[in-house]
Each structure stands twice: as C-alpha cells, then as structure tokens.
C-alpha cells in the first residue's frame, strides 16, 4: 500500500484560494470602519456636526446618512471582489452564495459599528485614522489568519485574535467559499473556536 497525499480543497495549490477571503475582510473593514470614522470626525472638525445636531433632523438619521453610503459602497465592493475572484482568479464559490452574502453583510454592519465607535472617542481625522489603523487594520492583517496561520501563533496572540471580527469573517468565508460546507457547520466551528478562546483567556 502506497499512501498518497491529496489536498481536498485546493489541490492545485493556488495562492488566490488563501488570500481572497483575507482581502475581502481587509477591504470591507477598511471602507466601513476607517472611512466612516474619518467622515464623521471631519464633520466634528469643521463644526458642521454641531449645526446638524441643533437642526430638526434626528441624530439617528444623521448617523444613518453617514453610514448608509459606506454600507452600499461596501456591498458594491463585495460584489466586485466576488466577480473578480470567480471570473479572473478562478476561485469558485463552492458553498451557498446566499449565506456568503449574508455573512458579509453582517460583517459590514459590525465594521460600520466599529467605525461609529471610533468616531465618538476621537476628535481629529488624524486620530481617527491612527486609531482605526492601529486597532483594526494592523490586527486584521497580522492576527486574523489572513497571512499567518492562527494555530502557529503564541497562545496570547491567539486569544487576542479571538476578539477580532475579521478572524471569524475570514474563517466563515473560507468555509463557505472554498470548502463549500453548510452554514450550520460554519456556526458550529465558529462557536467551538470562540468557546476555546474564552477558555484560553480564562487560563491566562
């Protein structure tokens, strides 16, 4: 008997299979969190935010007016990335396209919320850019599994990566898009990993 090694999900060893989910997470996080926070802080710097707040318009509608355009822009970018992945890079969508879009929309919503949170604690555009870059962009690139495998990281970095939304999004996209698994298995895998992360944090 001669054993043979066969790669189940990427037999041709294409690098696009690995970096496409990571690029999706990075671009969506960049557009939603960083651009939203900078846009709102710009209004605070120029003084137009105070004018808007004293106007008859409700604060909720002011926030929605800032967030909805980036939500739409992120959806357009998501569609563009998927089209380029399938028709240019030959990365198939092996699983459910519907659930892939649903998971992506949830991630966009979370990223927008993070951008709004950053805009409330910063007063200048430079500060908003630094906070979103250092607190979101760099961890997303280095600790989300986009470049380096999470399993090879030290335990403390694995615990830190557990709080990054991009980690769970990239993991879900890889399972839905590359592995083609059912969404229930994705939820089970994410829940199990999240539970293990809590146990790791408790033992530190």
Q: What do these predicted ranges mean?
A:
Residues 26-48, 116, 120:
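A hydrophobic alpha-helix feature that marks transmembrane segments and, especially
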Residues 38-71:
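Helix-loop-helix units of permease transmembrane domains in multi-pass membrane transporters
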Residues 42, 88-93, 122-123, 147-152, ...:
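Short helix-capping/hinge motifs at transmembrane helix termini and TM-loop junctions
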């Amino acid at each position: 008997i001669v054993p043979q090694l066969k790669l189940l999900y990427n037999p041709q060893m294409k690098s696009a299979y690995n970096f496409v989910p990571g690029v999706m997470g990075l671009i969506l996080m960049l557009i939603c969190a960083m651009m939203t926070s900078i846009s709102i802080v710009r209004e605070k710097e120029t003084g137009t935010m105070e004018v808007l707040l004293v106007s008859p318009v409700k604060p909720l509608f002011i926030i929605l007016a800032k967030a909805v355009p980036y939500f739409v822009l992120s959806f357009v970018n998501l569609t563009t990335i998927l089209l380029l992945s399938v028709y240019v890079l030959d990365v198939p969508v092996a699983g459910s396209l519907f659930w892939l879009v649903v998971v992506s929309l949830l991630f966009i919503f979370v990223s927008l919320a993070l951008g709004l949170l950053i805009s409330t604690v910063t007063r200048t555009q430079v500060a908003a850019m630094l906070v979103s870059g250092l607190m979101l962009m760099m961890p997303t690139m280095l600790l989300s599994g986009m470049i380096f495998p999470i399993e090879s990281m030290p335990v403390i970095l694995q615990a830190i990566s557990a709080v990054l939304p991009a980690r769970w999004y990239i993991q879900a996209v890889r399972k839905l898009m590359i592995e083609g698994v059912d969404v229930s298995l994705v939820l089970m895998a994410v829940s199990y990993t999240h539970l293990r992360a809590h146990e790791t944090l408790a033992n530190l």
